[in-house]
Amino acid sequence: MSIPFTRWPEEFARRYREKGYWQDLPLTDILTRHAASDSIAVIDGERQLSYRELNQAADNLACSLRRQGIKPGETALVQLGNVAELYITFFALLKLGVAPVLALFSHQRSELNAYASQIEPALLIADRQHALFSGDDFLNTFVTEHSSIRVVQLLNDSGEHNLQDAINHPAEDFTATPSPADEVAYFQLSGGTTGTPKLIPRTHNDYYYSVRRSVEICQFTQQTRYLCAIPAAHNYAMSSPGSLGVFLAGGTVVLAADPSATLCFPLIEKHQVNVTALVPPAVSLWLQALIEGESRAQLASLKLLQVGGARLSATLAARIPAEIGCQLQQVFGMAEGLVNYTRLDDSAEKIIHTQGYPMCPDDEVWVADAEGNPLPQGEVGRLMTRGPYTFRGYYKSPQHNASAFDANGFYCSGDLISIDPEGYITVQGREKDQINRGGEKIAAEEIENLLLRHPAVIYAALVSMEDELMGEKSCAYLVVKEPLRAVQVRRFLREQGIAEFKLPDRVECVDSLPLTAVGKVDKKQLRQWLASRASA
């Protein structure tokens, strides 16, 4: 039994195999190639697992789940945080030929119900330390409402569902049965900020290539010691090159529960971490922590800081080498496929001011206008892409696929970009972030980047607010070091030489900005704040 999904046309699949992108290997190969190694694969608090131990634990769990009736071709819903059991579970399910959805630990009732409704899982794996599963009320209701669930395993459980017991029970003559390499390996989550994230089917072939090529570009080796402080289940942390890239290279993943400086700085020093990945808000927190007295000596081993998940302003980018003392690599990718990196030997100009260029020669990327017509080089428009690791359709979502893809199979991500003569991409924002003020279009990220130049501004987010006369006006939400008045903000922006219509109509200074589950500023919530105040 195989999971239905939108496949690549045969001529594309043949070309990707001929060029060596697709090598018909299951993702389990990332781990099993090191199965005899006693090198440390994962550090989780005081626990350390070698590659041999990680592989054996995955075999044990897979064998236990098979005994409980879980079969190839079925699906699983998994919600685990930044713990070693996430990787044990991931590889165990791949070995069984079971395709999981890896829900983020921050997801709640609505998201879990939506995922379960879409994939009809046979298996649920969760953690008693999550508020939803701390008791049995939600669990019982969830399993009743989603009757496809036959098996439940819970981390930190003392009863019949104990995941740790299943992991510790020795495997008996276990033989892996991964799904074929051109079938669905697992589901990633769309990074969209509106509604429940859509499900993205990723095959072994396309995802393995993405990991393998990322490892080559980022030069991960057995000496790589990677701090995973962003959500480990997120695509960025899994494959760019992420933890899977570390495992492929034979390096070590060090897990952190969150990206706070107070937690991460000591871990970097203790485990001699040499690479990590952050989202821009976390970069700001690290820089602020150093200003406030955290010792930079703790970061002496850190050689490379990847930043992605949202566009990094040039202002912040320029501070990283000088203040953190390591090389910056910008990452612009999407769970749907396409990944762009600045290269390690790029000029400072490219690293600071662009988001890199595609990692595969067969990544087809162009810029379209609102009607889908190609735009000249350098102009800002909608990103269109297809390639050997960019999917061809969301799972069970024909209506959305009809608008997300053009007739030639190019995916429209909703990102607004420009491409320079050398192929480097600069992200200008999102279509939905464009504010239409009386017919004048304002790209929110342009104003946000200018606001971040102000010495008193730590974070900035520009959102639209409804206006009876203009249709929309703009509101700037700021997290500041010292009080700022709207008149001061507008004066500063005027000094940057921008048009008057781009000046924020309203300025709100707040203690913090709300974030989505993947660490991006939650502009939907900011707009809701405005709407609630307007109706009060």
UniProtKB/Swiss-Prot annotation:
Subunit-structure text: Proteins EntB, EntD, EntE, and EntF form a multienzyme complex called enterobactin synthase. Monomer. EntA and EntE interact together.
Induction: Under conditions of iron deficiency and by the fur protein.
Protein name according to UniProt: Enterobactin synthase component E
Listed GO CC annotations: cytosol; membrane
Enzyme class: ligase
Native source organism of the sequence: Escherichia coli (strain K12)
Record note on what altering R437D does: Catalyzes the adenylation reaction with 10% reduction of activity compared to the wild-type. 3% reduction of activity compared to the wild-type
MF GO annotations: 2,3-dihydroxybenzoate--[aryl-carrier protein] ligase; 2,3-dihydroxybenzoate-serine ligase activity; acyltransferase activity; ATP binding
Role summary: Involved in the biosynthesis of the siderophore enterobactin (enterochelin), which is a macrocyclic trimeric lactone of N-(2,3-dihydroxybenzoyl)-serine. The serine trilactone serves as a scaffolding for the three catechol functionalities that provide hexadentate coordination for the tightly ligated iron(2+) atoms. EntE processes via a two-step adenylation-ligation reaction (bi-uni-uni-bi ping-pong mechanism).
Protein's GO biological process: enterobactin biosynthetic process
